[in-house]
């Protein structure tokens, strides 16, 4: 808060050291920037809690919108699935659900929400500037957290290149994305050697993956596909869903140990 607006610094917020390495030299900037803006109106503690609360609402909204049959038709299935995912307690620090966000991973939650919305605007929205909005949202994804961006980028690129949008709009959208993300991305990759290893150990048992509290999520997804009456709706999201399932299975069974790194310095 003090460094961003007084000195216009997007990095170097902390000059502290831990074990010989700079600690929190910078973090994903978007949520802290918004928190800093709110701090002009509210106490910092209230601003921070407000950002956490907004991330929870935005996550559920993004999943609901992503599962719509059309751009303006509310999806009760999507709302239910989003709510169940938010309330799952199988994990408490990986990010996305309520427990993880309250533990401090609300940046991850924002990243997932923005990524979901970017896919929605790319494949379902009828908005005149849907491609540009999608580019903005995928840029906000990387500014919120790196890991969801890395997972969503391939499928976003597939839909982006596959779309019938005229070429000059695609180029302008791509340049818009670069304008948003390039400053942070360059800083991150130039200093990648200083990022911290989370000593992540991947799960190897199915019982670790399928917990009792996510069974309603699985059941809701099955019911959605069975009862969906729109074949076009299923087609429009089938590639996206197959991709997410495939990449999740691959990372679950073949993700190397200690391969998950914090995008922070």
Residue ranges and their predicted role:
Residues 1-265:
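Membrane-embedded transmembrane-helix bundle of lipid-linked glycan/lipid transferases
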């Amino acid at each position: 808060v003090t460094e961003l607006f007084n000195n216009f610094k997007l990095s170097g917020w902390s000059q502290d050291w831990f074990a010989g390495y700079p600690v929190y030299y910078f973090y994903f900037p978007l949520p802290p920037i918004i928190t800093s803006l709110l701090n002009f109106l509210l106490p910092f503690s209230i601003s921070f809690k407000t950002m956490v609360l907004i991330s929870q609402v935005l996550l559920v909204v993004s999943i609901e919108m992503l599962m719509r049959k059309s751009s303006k038709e509310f999806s009760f299935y999507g709302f239910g699935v989003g709510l169940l995912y938010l309330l799952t307690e199988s994990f408490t620090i990986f990010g996305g659900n309520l427990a993880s966000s309250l533990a401090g991973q609300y940046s991850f939650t924002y990243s997932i929400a923005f990524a979901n919305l970017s896919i929605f605007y790319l494949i379902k929205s009828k908005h005149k500037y849907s491609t540009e909005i999608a580019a903005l949202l995928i840029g906000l994804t990387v500014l919120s957290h790196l890991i969801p961006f890395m997972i969503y980028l391939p499928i976003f690129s597939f839909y982006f290149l596959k779309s019938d949008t005229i070429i000059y709009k695609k180029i302008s959208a791509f340049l818009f994305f670069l304008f948003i993300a390039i400053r942070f991305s360059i800083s991150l990759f130039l200093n990648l050697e200083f990022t911290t290893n989370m000593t992540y150990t991947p799960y190897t048992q199915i019982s670790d993956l399928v917990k009792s509290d996510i069974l309603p999520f699985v059941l809701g997804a099955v019911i959605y596909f069975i009862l969906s009456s729109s074949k076009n709706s299923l087609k429009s999201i089938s590639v996206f869903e197959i991709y997410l399932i495939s990449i999740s299975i691959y990372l679950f069974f073949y993700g190397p140990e200690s391969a998950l790194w914090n995008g922070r310095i």
